Amino acid sequence: MKVTVDQDLCIACGTCIDLCPSVFDWDDEGLSHVIVDEVPEGAEDSCARESVNECPTEAIKEV
């Protein structure tokens, strides 16, 4: 599984980072970004999917 963050839609609410800190982190501009090339299977896979579902601006997409 791979995910992306649309920087134009991100409002820096931090939901994805709270839910899945091993996949998302803050960038230098204070927005969320993906820190792994591919989300590991298992627990991380589920927290990444939860981040996709919980993002209030739908900035996170599974690709």
Swiss-Prot record:
- Domain of life here? Bacteria
Pfam families tied to this protein: Fer4_13 (PF13370)
Alphabetical UniProt keywords? 4Fe-4S, Electron transport, Iron, Iron-sulfur, Metal-binding, Transport
GO terms assigned for molecular function: 4 iron, 4 sulfur cluster binding; electron transfer activity; iron ion binding
Residues engaged in binding [4Fe-4S] cluster: 10, 13, 16, 55
> Would the keyword 4Fe-4S be found if you checked this record's keyword annotation?
yes
Task: Show the stretches that span the lipid bilayer.
Answer: none
Q: Report the function annotation for this chain.
A: Ferredoxins are iron-sulfur proteins that transfer electrons in a wide variety of metabolic reactions.
Q: Please report the name of this protein according to its UniProt entry.
A: Ferredoxin
